[in-house]
Amino acid sequence: MSIISTLLGKSKRGGKTSPAAQRLVRNMRYELVPLKSLDQAIADLPKGAAVSVTCSPAKGIATTQQLCEQLLEKGHNVVPHFAARLVEGPEHAAKLAAWVREKGIKEVFIIGGDAEVPPHYQYALPFMKDFLEAQPGVDTIGFGAYPDGHATISKGDLHN
């Protein structure tokens, strides 16, 4: 029996789970990283799971999009992460917005990203502006914030 089933109160042991814990588990979101164990991770997802799909500098945005499409085909609700430092410019931002709109994705997560040499966007905010101008049709945009600082980003850059 999975921990999710147990927390949802479906334990064979007959134990009760509090309604608050059950709500938390029902609303949880999984995060997938494109690693070697990805196929198994996808297979282990519960039906209709909400899944955040990360965007790594090594794999790129196209991999994030491909993984999102694969998950959408399996009936999952996806939240693609877009790293601004991997976006090539306003045209690319508009293409991403069109893709999000076409796929019916209602939430995205935008970060600055870790790519060392950005092709166009140094920070998340300029990309976010271009992305929104292209009318992606999203209801929610998540973004990264580091109130306690970041190991590799200066305080000045964090304020941008």
What are these regions (language model features)?
Residues 2-160:
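Active-site beta->alpha loop and helix N-cap motifs at the rims of alpha/beta catalytic domains
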